[in-house]
From Swiss-Prot:
Lineage, uppermost ranks: Bacteria, Pseudomonadati, Pseudomonadota, Betaproteobacteria, Rhodocyclales
Binding residues for ATP: 8-15
Entry keyword annotation includes NAD: no
Identification of the protein by name: Nucleotide-binding protein Daro_0070
Protein family according to the UniProt entry: Belongs to the RapZ-like family.
GO MF term set: ATP binding; GTP binding
Record-listed GTP binding positions: 57-60
Amino acid sequence: MELILISGLSGSGKSVALNLLEDSGYYCVDNLPVVMLTVLIGMLKEEHVHKVAVAIDARSGHGIDLLPGKLDKLKRSGINLTFLFLFSHEETLLKRYSESRRRHPLATKGQTLEEAIRAERALLDPISDLGHRIDTSGMKANALREWVRQFIEAEPGQGLTLMFESFGFKYGIPLDADLVFDVRCLPNPHYDPELRPFNGKDKPIIDFLEGEDEVCRMRDDIARFVDTWLPCYIRDNRNYLTVAIGCTGGQHRSVYIAEWLAGEFANRARVLVRHRTLAGT
């Protein structure tokens, strides 16, 4: 059985991810109490259900403390388990709740929205590092759906998943990054009016950047660094490694280098690529 477990902060996109998985053929269960997880999986195995996605949130209360043990038990039973933890900056969550006008699930009478968000963050903190952390701050629903689709369509198998992520420093450093490389010192196509409308996946930008020695040297240096230390991360039993590449706006230099790195490592690991602040995503 393939099991994708989703948890994280309310308002960070769990429902968006779960809906995409349901559309992709997964048997989905939302807001499942932790104590019921192994019971549900046992029942679905008897029914020969092979693809399952379950969302668990803070409404499980202190039952959240039981989750690490439940996950270990499921892994020992031979289930192919993936755990995704979604989160966002507090200001992003406040904005989303303001726009949706929905009530926070942990909000109590006399408690502010900020207090409810912080209480939920504290409650879920012990499980936030059990799997792959995804910072959805600034991500639109369609971008999150595309990321989940790319994730589940990636070549299955054991081993580490290597994510190359581009971003713009003016929007902030992604909190889910394990390694961050700053490429703002490289020549910037933004200052060429003819190149500005393109992005780092377009041939005019690729040709411009690959014609600059500094770009090629930094690109190759980053690849060597990742290649040198990747075995160490694998030995540490890491399931995921997110390498973030940042330029000023996240449109040209970082996008090009993230795409190039994804191509370089495609035959050495399970590779994903994401462009956090690319226009139109």
